[in-house]
Regions:
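Positively charged, polyanion-binding regions of nucleic-acid-associated proteins
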Residues: 254-270, 282, 457-466
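Phosphate-backbone binding and catalysis cores of DNA-processing enzymes
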Residues: 29, 41, 88-266, 356-409, ...
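Flexible beta-alpha connector loops of hexameric P-loop NTPases
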Residues: 75-79, 287, 483
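Basic, low-complexity terminal or inter-domain segments flanking catalytic cores
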Residues: 24-27, 38, 47, 173, ...
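Short glycine-centered, acidic/aromatic-flanked micro-motifs in structured strand/loop junctions
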Residues: 103-105, 282-284, 312
Length: 803
């Protein structure tokens, strides 16, 4: 152990300090077991590394937990599932001579270190805070050589965010329960993200498509060997109407064409900066199809394994070690010509984050061990980092202007050729929008000024203006970053939360057929035809739900500050100022609360004539009763009649794809034709209806979902019978074994294989055991073993213990 540290520094004083420390008992506490495992490899037997499994305490879940009168003092508690762990850490800390708090280096990590210090009742004289933005031997040893105190400014910045968000959530949610519907909740940053999605949806619905004609021509030009080759050119302007486009083609019939001007200029393309959290989330979504949450989970694993630097950062800076490593790797693989070392400047302030971009810890490692998904993400990070230190791509762009006799219009032909690929050899950046994609490079044939050109087909194609695209998770992150809303640590949770709360849903939209006109001038004849195309198809886009739209409109009206982009961005800046020690966190809380709380009180006192979000569609033919849409207890509903009528109102659930903002009176009335009875099967009635989860068949109190291919208005009794039988078959296959003497225990077949379910909890069955052979005693033994293992083996999802 001693010689292990003596390699670190020639400085005798440092050696003596480290030697003294190494003789003592050292306890290192980190957040995750994976991180602990990696660090343990570097520190040797004199150091014990334990994990806190994230935060060991938090604000009380079901209480406000903030004493506004006492300077916003928070009330923290240790969750029940962390108590045993905290006791273990207390015992270990008591026995240790030095405790090293090695949680992550951002605000969240600093807060974890502070909570550990407080809860474990550590003493300043034997507590050291160490930080590093990569888990490598040199980084860990350097951190141990340079410990510091807990930075209370960073802790206060994190605490301020947590408390402000708790105030907003706890005070706004009851307003939503009373005014919109029960069980809703509101979040500060999430509400702004929902607003962006709602506004984009309205822009799309309000968008008026305009048509215009794009004119392209094919010219036949002799190549270097005299062979005629095709050169494409485009008219410099769009033509508004079909009549004008036809007149233009007619004018071209007798016209002559000539090269008026040729310009050739060099073009340089510079590589993008290394990854920050948001650019990694965007590129992983575009190139690999990962969700924002998936990217962060994989990046965390890569970081904890020591493969990449810290994954929550808004810095594009690279250390000298990284640039040197990149240079060596580039020379080895591609030669000196491909090297161009660069220093990128970080534009966002964000003083709380790690001070380096996301990069591989060792640039010589072109690949790493891990799952296929981890390997792909690592490869993306490696390529982006290497590319950032590579030479510009050198291109040559040639533009030829072609005149038309008797017209002031000109055609333009553009050719581009890569002279030196530079960083493009390794990496090309992707785009959210297809329009941003660049055309493939192509050369123009040799041309001379004044050269007469022979034309092939000249085509006028009707094209349409494009509505704004819906957000993807990645483009929403980009927008939030542009607006200065949120920070690297908040993008992924924000996007997950708005979907979990069902304010936003990720989905696909089928395209619609559209006709467009094409006129072709060829062999002195104009051919006029209509073609069909599919337009507007979208995949994995974010759509606002009706509840999300109603909540957004309500908050925008009564709490404009919370929904204001500039206000939300200014709060982020205030958190940065707290982190830098420029301002007291309590004064920011007070300024916010003094304005916010009265508006909550005032809103609760307002009495409205209509329910929030209600929209009157018209009257029911024959009865004259009001037909409306509103948010009901379980989501959006169509209602015929009002509570004032003698008869009770009738309700119908909307179909998937219908929205409160766009549903028509006719579509609403159609919904009341359901449920409809199809007939009888096995002596019981079979009916079809629409519920909050879509259309269903109901038979003998059993609901069966309708597949997308079947329309509830057209389904036959025979088709319904088939669905009932298929559901029964699946149920039979799901139940493997039951025990009469213990009715709460059952062996089931799930989507991930067989498992035991008992008293609301699920337990794994080892792969080498045949589920059918298990006795009740064997099942109880497996349950006991897994319960004893505690939090280390508890998994989120199917095998999570239900509270």
């Amino acid at each position: 152990g001693e010689s292990f540290f003596l390699l670190l520094s020639p400085n005798i004083v440092v050696q003596a300090i480290i030697k003294e420390r190494i003789m003592q008992k050292n306890l290192v506490i980190v957040e995750s077991p994976a991180k602990a495992k990696t660090i343990e490899k570097f520190l040797g037997k004199d150091f014990k590394v334990l994990s806190s499994y994230g935060h060991i305490r938090d604000l009380k879940k079901k209480e406000f937990s903030i004493d506004v009168e006492k300077n916003f003092t928070p009330s923290y508690e240790i969750p029940a599932d962390k108590k045993a762990l905290v006791n273990t850490l207390k015992t270990e800390a008591k026995d240790a001579e030095t405790v090293w708090l090695a949680s992550d280096e951002d605000r969240e990590g600093e807060a974890i270190a502070w909570h550990l210090y407080e809860v474990l009742k550590l003493k300043p004289e034997n507590t050291k805070r160490i930080v590093f933005h990569e888990i490598t031997k040199s980084a860990i040893l350097k951190a141990i050589e340079q410990p510091r105190d807990i930075d209370l400014n960073l802790v206060n910045a994190q605490q301020a965010r947590r408390i402000l968000d708790r105030i907003v959530g706890f005070e706004l949610s009851p307003v939503l329960w009373r005014k919109v519907k029960p069980a809703l909740s509101a979040g500060r940053v999430q509400s702004v993200a929902v607003r962006l999605i709602v506004e984009r949806e309205r822009e799309i619905h309000a968008f008026q498509t305009e048509a215009a004609y794009r004119i392209t021509a094919v010219f036949l030009v002799p190549d270097t060997d005299g062979k005629l080759v095709e050169m494409k050119a485009e008219l410099a302007r769009r033509i508004k109407t079909k009549e004008e486009a036809k007149a233009f083609l007619n004018a071209c019939q007798g016209a002559s064409f000539a090269i008026d001007d040729i310009t050739t200029r060099p073009v340089k393309k510079t590589p993008p900066a290394p990854f920050t959290t948001s650019t990694l989330q965007q590129e992983a979504a575009r190139k690999l199809g990962y969700t924002v949450a998936q990217t962060m989970m994989l990046a965390q694993r890569l970081y904890e394994s020591g493969f990449i630097t810290y994954m929550r950062t808004d810095s594009v800076n690279l250390s000298e070690f990284a640039t040197t490593g990149s240079k060596d790797a580039i020379i080895k693989m591609m030669g000196d010509r491909y090297v161009h070392l660069r220093h990128f400047e970080t534009k966002t302030k964000g003083a709380q984050e790690a001070h380096e971009a996301i990069r591989p810890t060792y640039m010589e490692n072109q690949s790493v061990e891990g799952t296929a998904q981890e390997k792909k993400l690592y490869d993306l990070i490696w390529k982006r980092t290497i590319a950032s230190q590579m030479a510009d791509a050198e291109l040559e762009k040639t533009t030829a202007t072609i005149t038309i006799s008797g017209s002031s219009d000109v055609f333009t032909a553009i050719g581009e050729v890569i002279k030196f690929d530079g960083f493009l050899r390794v990496y090309r950046e992707s785009y959210d929008d297809d329009n941003e994609q660049e055309d493939e490079s192509h050369l123009l044939p040799p041309l001379k000024k004044g050269q007469k050109l022979e034309h092939g087909p000249i085509i006028a194609t009707e094209r349409f203006t494009q509505r704004p695209p819906r957000y993807t998770e990645a483009s929403l992150v980009r927008k939030l970053e542009e607006l200065g809303i949120g920070r690297p640590s908040t993008y992924a949770p924000t996007i997950s939360t708005i979907q979990q709360r069902e304010y936003v849903e990720k989905g696909n939209k089928d395209g619609e057929e559209r006709q467009f006109n094409v006129m072709t001038l060829k062999d002195r004849q104009i051919k006029d035809e209509n073609h069909t195309e599919i337009t507007g198809a979208e995949k994995a886009k974010l759509f606002p739900t009706d509840t999300g739209t109603v909540v957004n409109d309500f908050l925008t009206e009564y709490f404009p500050d919370i929904l204001d982009f500039n206000f939300t961005a200014s709060v982020e800046k205030e958190f940065d100022e707290i982190a830098e020690g420029e301002v007291k966190w309590t004064s920011i809380m007070k300024n916010f609360y003094d304005k916010f709380h009265p508006s909550v009180e005032n809103t609760l006192a307002i009495k409205t004539e209509h329910k929030v979000g209600e929209r009157i569609l018209g009257e029911e033919p024959g009865t004259g009763k009001t037909v409306s849409v509103k948010i009901g207890r379980f989501g959006p509903v169509v209602q015929i009649g009002t509570v004032e009528d003698e008869e009770k109102p009738r309700f119908a659930q909307m179909k998937k794809g219908q929205s409160m903002e766009t549903i028509t009176l006719e579509e609403a009335l159609e919904l009341f034709k359901l449920p409809r009875t199809l007939g009888e099967y096995e002596g019981k009635s079979v009916s079809v209806g629409v519920g909050r989860f879509g259309p269903y068949v109901l038979h003998n109190k059993v609901y069966v979902s309708l597949p997308k291919t079947l329309d509830p208005m057209e389904i036959t009794l025979e088709e319904a019978e088939q669905l009932i039988l298929e559901k029964r078959q699946k149920e039979t296959e799901r139940h493997i074994k039951k025990f009469e003497e213990e009715p709460e225990l059952e062996i089931l077949n799930g989507r991930y294989g067989p498992y035991i379910t008992y008293k609301g909890s699920n337990y794994k069955i080892p792969k080498d055991i045949v589920p059918q052979d298990l006795s009740l005693a064997s099942c109880l033994e497996l349950i006991k073993l897994q319960d004893e293992k505690g939090p280390a083996t508890t998994k989120k999802g199917r095998f999570a213990k239900k509270k």
